């Protein structure tokens, strides 16, 4: 479904390239590998194995110019009201740097810096308190980002604090976490933007009771009064966040409190520095050399012009194993929309399904389908040039597999035996971090954030609301009393029957 006139010339390019092979594109454009490579700080990204040529890329860039992608990026940074449905700015960039001369953004940056200083005081106090473990309770944006960064960057040994994450309302998750801990040496953090999230409130109550009160409870919320009241948490242990920061963009805020506890406050600030470096690039680089713009346009090409319905992310670094889950929320919650900013139906398909895993494990699970299945799945392959562990041969083998898989997916290999024939033609983007440092991870995450925004501008949708998550939560709230024995009228016949089965 791509009927928008802005895509007309792109359709002709897609048709022209229908029979092209990726090796053929590389041969036809001798400088392609260098021309389609960009470096931004610690990140190197190469698009040469995508299935477009220079002419098609110019048409994509013309579409971006026509949709005023550059102006939209500036409006985002300046703190203009880009979240129209909720009447808000989206100033997550101001959490990590002061890169634009605009009063709203400058005020947000100053506010965020002040709260970050408060957070640093709390981090150091906890490090010196005798507490050994911290349980962080949150879900969605209050969990996925902090969990990813803490897992990726936590030291192998010598950490002052061990941080554990609980998100699911399933009591088994909390039970398994608490079973390994000593309540006398444990603190808890409750993270919720509204402090009305069912999962966080229920898990928070379990944690509060297990700790024997609120003396070692902390909270992060855009509703600090409600947070303090719900669990009697002292005001000096409640850190604010703001309605101009969406949950899935909030790890840079006080939502990153558990990150700072897990990796140290200085390294948390280095994470922000890496993101700010990518912000400056996204804001200042011309479209044709703008990494997030090119990444976003590549995703537009694969979705709308080539018709690919899913996108895979393979992290050839075990420490980034949680990145695909994080990106699922970032991309699919931001871009999973069926109406434009003015409420009219979209005229193109929007977000594909994002999924993935860590290499080389994934080679022994779903790579069979990637190589020989009937659906072509564009992919991002992410690796690190340098490793931090002492097992050099293992790291060399890991990188050899990364390179081999991208080559095999793109080039394929013919065979007289159809069962052993590899068709190739599977596009991928290669992303290399110099090493898995806080700066590099910050830059990587910020790149994806901006690429998502670029796509939202092209599709004319709002990347910063998420009304699609509300209906199921509302229905669950109405059904909970029925499972607790109350007589509740249930209109849906299937739900009514299953409730009867559940209640015996």
From Swiss-Prot:
Q: Which UniProt keywords apply?
A: Cytoplasm, Gluconeogenesis, Glycolysis, Isomerase
Entry-linked Gene3D superfamilies: 1.10.1390.10, Glucose-6-phosphate isomerase like protein, domain 1
**What broad class describes the main subcellular location of this protein?**
cytoplasm
| Catalyzed reactions | alpha-D-glucose 6-phosphate = beta-D-fructose 6-phosphate
- Pathway named in the protein's UniProt entry: Carbohydrate biosynthesis; gluconeogenesis; Carbohydrate degradation; glycolysis; D-glyceraldehyde 3-phosphate and glycerone phosphate from D-glucose: step 2/4
Q: Name one Pfam family in it.
A: PGI
Question: Which SUPFAM superfamilies does UniProt cross-reference here?
Answer: SIS domain
Compartments, record wording: Cytoplasm
- Pull one GO CC term from this UniProt entry: cytosol
- State the similarity comment: Belongs to the GPI family.
What is the name attached to this protein's record?
Answer: Glucose-6-phosphate isomerase
Q: Which organism is it from?
A: Stenotrophomonas maltophilia (strain K279a)
């Amino acid at each position: 479904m791509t009927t928008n006139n802005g895509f007309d010339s792109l359709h002709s390019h897609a048709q022209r390239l229908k029979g092209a092979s990726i090796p053929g594109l590389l041969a036809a454009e001798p400088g392609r590998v260098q021309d389609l490579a960009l470096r931004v700080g610690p990140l190197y990204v190469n698009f040469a194995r995508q299935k477009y040529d220079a002419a098609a890329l110019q048409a994509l860039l013309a579409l971006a110019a026509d949709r005023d992608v550059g102006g939209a990026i500036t409006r985002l940074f300046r703190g203009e009201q880009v979240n129209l449905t909720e009447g808000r700015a989206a100033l997550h960039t101001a959490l990590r740097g002061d890169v634009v001369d605009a009063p709203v953004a400058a005020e947000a940056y100053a506010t965020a810096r002040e709260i970050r200083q408060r957070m640093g005081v709390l981090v150091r106090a906890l490090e010196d308190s005798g507490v050994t473990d911290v349980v962080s309770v949150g879900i969605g944006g209050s969990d996925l980002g902090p969990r990813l960064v803490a897992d990726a960057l936590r030291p192998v040994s010598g950490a002052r604090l061990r941080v554990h994450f609980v998100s699911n309302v399933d009591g088994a998750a909390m039970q398994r976490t608490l079973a390994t801990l000593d309540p006398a040496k444990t603190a808890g953090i409750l993270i919720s933007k509204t402090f009305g999230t069912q999962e966080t409130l229920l898990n928070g109550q379990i944690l509060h009771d297990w700790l024997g009160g609120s003396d070692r409870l902390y909270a992060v919320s855009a509703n600090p009064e409600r947070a303090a009241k719900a669990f009697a948490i002292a005001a000096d242990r409640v850190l604010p966040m703001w309605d101009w920061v969406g949950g899935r963009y909030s790890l840079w805020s006080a939502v990153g409190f558990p990150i700072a506890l897990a990796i140290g406050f200085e390294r948390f600030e280095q994470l922000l520095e890496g993101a700010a470096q990518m912000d400056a690039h996204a804001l200042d680089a011309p479209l044709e050399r703008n990494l997030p713009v090119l990444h976003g346009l590549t995703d537009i090409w694969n979705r709308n012009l080539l018709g690919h319905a899913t996108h895979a992310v393979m992290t050839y670094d075990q420490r980034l194993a949680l990145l695909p889950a994080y990106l699922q929320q970032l991309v699919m919650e931001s871009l999973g929309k069926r109406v434009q900013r003015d409420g009219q139906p979209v005229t193109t398909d929007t977000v594909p399904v994002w999924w993935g895993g860590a290499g080389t494990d994934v080679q022994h699970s779903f790579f069979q389908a990637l190589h020989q299945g009937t659906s072509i799945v564009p992919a991002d392959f992410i690796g690190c040039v340098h490793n931090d562990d002492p097992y050099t041969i293992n790291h060399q083998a890991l990188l050899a597999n990364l390179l081999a898989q991208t080559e095999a997916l793109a080039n394929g290999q013919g065979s007289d035996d159809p069962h052993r024939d590899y068709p190739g033609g599977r596009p991928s983007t290669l992303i290399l971090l110099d090493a898995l440092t806080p700066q590099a991870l910050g830059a990587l995450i910020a790149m994806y954030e901006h690429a998502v925004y670029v796509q939202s501008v092209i599709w004319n949708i709002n990347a910063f609301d998420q009304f699609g998550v509300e209906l199921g939560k509302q229905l669950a709230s109405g059904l909970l009393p029925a499972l607790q024995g109350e007589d509740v009228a249930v209109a849906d016949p299937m739900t009514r029957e299953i409730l009867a089965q559940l209640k015996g």
